[in-house]
Amino acid sequence: MKRYYITDRKAVGGFRPLLEIIRDQMHLGVDFIQIREKDITARELFEFTLAVLEVRENEMRKRLPIKILVNSRADVALATGADGVHLPSNAPEETLPGLVVFRSCHTLEEIKASRADFVTFGPVFESPGKGEPAGLEALKAACQLGKRVYALGGVNWENAAECMHAGAEGIAGIRLFQDPAL
């Protein structure tokens, strides 16, 4: 089961604690880290991405490669040497040579139209502020469309196996990786 960690510094008290969580998740074998700090400047995003890449460089001697993705900003991903970008569902479809591309999808139609390398699909389960959950049957249908799908939204360690059974390549989340209670 592949794991896709989406960051939220506000939930953990800032950049310094977030870097510690990122380091811990690298040691725990996370496969992707999406830097999703939407409210910071391009300069701050650039600098934080470089800090995450430095942590990865220091930790890679001990682990398999971990892909670092920048939320919405292909320019920052390219400028920092990050591995890819995560695009929201409303972003224009584009080809970004040299970058791994994830796209948020909330409907089967969005998945069918996507040219991304991977998609996150959800919310699969109940998740605060994310609307009506799609459910496992919709996830199963999404996974049958020939895309590499990561289940998102309300996923926890107890229901992760159900997502994998539905055909997901992996699981994605914020609280899943930042909240020890999950």
Which residue stretches match the model-derived regions?
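Conserved N-terminal beta1-alpha1 strand-loop-helix module at the mouth
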Residues: 1-118, 133-134, 141, 145-149, ...
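A short acidic, helix-capping loop that chelates divalent metal ions and anchors anionic groups
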Residues: 77, 125-130
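Conserved, surface-exposed functional patches that form binding/active-site neighborhoods
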Residues: 122
